[in-house]
Structure formats: structure tokens, C-alpha cells
């Protein structure tokens, strides 16, 4: 990796955040697979550190949260003791928060879809906010105690609970059952009913699946190591927050949120390595 100049590194990183697999990047750039992977992991650590230090004291008003599924090494049904001994494998969930106004992603967390990860995620989110916010999640029960632990009573929280129809008997589906309706449920505080929504975070989930090859469903593209999975998300969200101009806002989410006063380039992200 030390032999790559900034332009070549930028080419590799651009491909990573625009939905290319590691092997396709090798074919396009001529950079070796090991070098691409090493750059990803090292840059991911630098991006994670930068966002952890700078995405604080945020003046968000409305925040939406959700979880997105992926797997590492193999799907959960194929996990064996031998595979577990070699490292993390099976289903993994990425918990994501988004500011509904600025589209900034203040934090994300990789773990299981369980109460422990939910609590850690909510405590991380609460620690980044400068004021009381309206929070909306789906109907996952893990959020109830997690939000209570992280925010106490200093939150306007509601759930948007989707109602699904039944699948025709004997029919298999790759997507969830058809959503036939939604129920808004106030949990704590005084959330504005007009803003009880998960539309932005669900659109963010699609952005992740389109932008990171390892999240693309029904393919053989998946993370082989948890370290690479975390690194790819860190690089992507650094790019999403600071480099990628949001079409509606016409600025980056970081600029809209007042975190940055300028438009970053991918070369600026690479500069974090130094």
C-alpha cells in the first residue's frame, strides 16, 4: 500500500463506496487484492476515529433509527463450531441513525439484533446530541429499554409499527411480506405525529445496499472478515457525510449539520491516514 500514490488510492476508495467488489477493484485498477484490503482496513480505522471525535454536540431535531441485515463468512444456518473458532461468522446487523433534516448519519454500530447492542447504540447516539430530539424507530422491542436507559425522560419517542399481510400458503419470498398498514405509537414525551416516520432511514438502508457491494442481497458478495465489514462501513459513512452531495440539500450532510464548512474530496479522506 505504501507504493500507491494518492491518485491511485482515491481511485480504489471511489470504487469501494460506489458499489464495487474487492475483486472488481483489482481488475479495474491493477492494485493487488491484499493491498486493496489493507488500504480499506487502515483507512476505515482512520475514518472511524475522525467521525467519533467530530460527530458530537449535534443540534439534531428529528432522528430516525433502524437496523440492516448482512452476514459475515456464511449465513447463520451454515455456521459451525469450526467456523466460529476461526472468527466471527453468521448474521450481523448494522444499527444506523439518521438526522431527518440534514441527512447526517451521526453514528452506526455493528452487532447482533439484541438488547445489548440496542443499548450500546442508543447510548452512543445520546452522547452525540446537544439537545432533546424526536426519535422514531420501528417496532423492535429492544428499543424500549435501550431508549429509556440512554435518554431517560429527555426524549420524544415514538414507534412506527408496520402491519404485514400473510404470505400465500406454500409461497416463498425473498422480501418481507406486503405491508398493509402502519400504526404510530407514542412511547415517551410528546412526539409530533406528523414526523413519526422511518422513511429517511429506510431510504438510507437502500443507499447502503446500493453503495457497498458486501450488502447487496442475493449475490455471493459478502464480508469474509468482521474487520473488513466494519472498515467498509466506516469509509462509506465518512464519504457519505463529508464528500457526497445530497441531491435535495445540494450540500453534504456534514455541511448541512454544521459539522464541516467545506466540501471534502476523497483525497481529503485519504489524508486522514497521515
What are these regions (language model features)?
Residues 1-274:
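Residue-level recognition of single "structural anchor" positions
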